[in-house]
């Protein structure tokens, strides 16, 4: 990567900020409806993503339970898992009444279960199919259709591989790419290990922005603080800046960092809710919507008091 900065460029300002300036990643068993309600209490501007929802679940399951997005104001994206263009188009149409601002195709999950369904990271090995999926989804909605992907698959981790993948999908009309800056290893690593073992190569995001200047490029991968987000957004390489940053585990491990997003990244006033008030609001939301469920998802509220003087 060329580290020569271009002094004439200025940092992103709120008036010109990309809609994808700050995003919270789709995370299985985490970013369900109560979690997104919780996140929205902390940031008005951040873009929130659902858990991945498969096309089969939407066709055969309870759509209100899977897609309900009530009381989660602000920009929210539905992430879909699938590889059949017709089924993805059906899922997009079925989700239309629920008010999502974006439909995202998962091309990054490496889990064996997802691979058996022929979607997730293994889709990167068939860029033409991904392009067909994107075209079908775009034909079914006027909302943005985006793709979240890795920078490589197994031994295919050279820049040319991800560049050609993005190029094929770009030609299908996709203009926003969320780049998880690690390769996916489809054999031999667990999903958790796939988030930690493959080398982090953030430079790929700037290389893609250089080669696809009209695309929105969002960097995902081990981003932990709003200060780090700000620094990454201000970095200039090869004369370009990336358009956005996506955080993952930090959003539930140290969720109070989300309360800094609007001020640090958008120049707006901070939230005034206390941690205790946020916890009370989330508990009321969970009681209202999930009192009848027979399972309990892990809650990001568990991290609200982390790093406080009285916390362990």
Regions found by a protein language model. Give the residues of each.
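Conserved, mostly hydrophobic/aromatic
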Residues: 24, 39, 78, 105, ...
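Catalytic cores of alpha/beta
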Residues: 90-94, 160-164, 223-243
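Glycine-rich phosphate-binding active-site loops on the catalytic face of alpha/beta enzymes
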Residues: 240-258
């Amino acid at each position: 990567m060329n580290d020569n900065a271009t002094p004439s460029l200025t940092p992103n300002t709120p008036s010109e900020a990309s809609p994808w300036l700050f995003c919270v990643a789709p995370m299985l068993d985490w970013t369900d409806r109560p979690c997104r309600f919780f996140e929205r209490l902390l940031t008005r501007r951040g873009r929130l993503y659902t858990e991945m929802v498969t096309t089969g679940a939407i066709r055969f399951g309870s759509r209100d339970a899977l897609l309900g997005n009530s009381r989660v104001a602000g920009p929210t994206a539905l992430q879909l898992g699938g590889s059949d263009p017709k089924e993805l188009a059906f899922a997009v149409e079925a989700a239309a009444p629920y008010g999502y601002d974006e439909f995202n195709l998962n091309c990054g999950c490496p889990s064996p279960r997802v691979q058996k369904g022929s979607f997730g990271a293994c889709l990167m090995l068939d860029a033409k199919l991904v392009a067909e999926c994107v075209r079908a989804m775009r034909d079914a909605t006027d909302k943005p259709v985006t793709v979240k992907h890795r920078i490589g698959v197994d031994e295919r981790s050279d820049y040319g591989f991800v560049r050609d993948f993005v190029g094929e999908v770009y030609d299908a009309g996709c203009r926003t790419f969320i780049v998880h800056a690690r390769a996916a290893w489809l054999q031999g690593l667990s999903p958790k290990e796939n988030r930690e073992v493959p080398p982090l190569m953030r430079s790929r995001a700037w290389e893609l922005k250089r080669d696809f200047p009209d695309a929105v490029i969002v960097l995902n991968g081990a981003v932990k603080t709003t200060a780090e987000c700000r620094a990454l957004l201000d970095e200039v390489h090869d004369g370009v800046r990336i358009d956005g940053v996506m955080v993952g585990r930090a959003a539930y491990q140290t969720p109070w960092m989300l309360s800094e997003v609007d001020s640090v990244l958008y120049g707006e006033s901070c939230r005034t809710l206390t941690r205790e008030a946020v916890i009370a609001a989330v508990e009321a939301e969970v009681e209202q919507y999930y009192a009848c469920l027979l399972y309990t998802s892990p809650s990001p509220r568990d991290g609200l008091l982390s790093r406080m003087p009285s916390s362990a």
